[in-house]
């Protein structure tokens, strides 16, 4: 995919390497053409105790994506990656853009990193989970949940590797072909 563009739609932070701050340097290092749009801005990962969250309004996010779709460069789009969303209202315009991009640029790959929470705790409002499950998951080719996020998306308890495989298989329908789950509890540790 070295000649196609990846569009990364996720968070930006002042300090740290999460969201677009993590993705873009990797793409640059790999000489992979990539562009980004930020869903939110934060001082740092919320785990650092920061509280200020500046959410890109859904209408603005939708307008930016619609304008991007009018650019000549849009025809070179090969993949879309999404991560953290600050409000459930952001998901509909992103889902619409993914659908339009898929129609205009077949084949396009959509990777959903469902940044929802970890270790049994949601980082986001539950309405984001609902919108993600309803509007983004059906468009995804690849998802990269941690164990907690896989539990939420599949709506099933995951206590071990066997449960994780079962949950992943439950989700693999329609476009979805790859579930790359992290932090799965095993008898000896985690995978």
What are these regions (language model features)?
Residues 2-112, 116-119:
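Conserved N-terminal subdomain of the carbohydrate kinase-like
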Residues 123-191:
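Conserved phosphate/ATP/ADP-binding segment of small-molecule kinases
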């Amino acid at each position: 995919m070295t000649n196609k563009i990846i569009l990364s739609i996720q968070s930006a932070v002042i300090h740290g390497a999460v969201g677009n701050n993590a993705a873009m340097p990797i793409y640059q290092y790999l000489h992979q053409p990539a562009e980004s749009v930020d869903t939110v801005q934060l001082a740092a990962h919320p785990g650092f105790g920061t509280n200020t969250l500046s959410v890109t309004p859904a209408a603005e996010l939708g307008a930016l994506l619609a304008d991007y779709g009018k650019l000549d460069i849009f025809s070179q789009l090969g993949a879309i990656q999404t991560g953290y969303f600050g409000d459930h209202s952001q998901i509909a315009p992103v889902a619409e853009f993914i659908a339009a991009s898929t129609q205009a640029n077949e084949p396009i790959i959509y990777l959903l990193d469902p940044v929802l929470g970890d270790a049994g705790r949601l980082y986001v409002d539950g309405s984001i989970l609902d919108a993600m499950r309803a509007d983004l998951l059906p468009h995804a080719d690849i998802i990269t949940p941690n164990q907690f996020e896989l539990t939420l998306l599949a709506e099933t308890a995951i206590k071990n590797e066997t449960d994780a495989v079962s949950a992943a298989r439950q989700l693999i329908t329609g476009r979805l072909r790859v579930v790359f789950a992290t932090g799965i509890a095993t008898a000896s540790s985690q995978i």
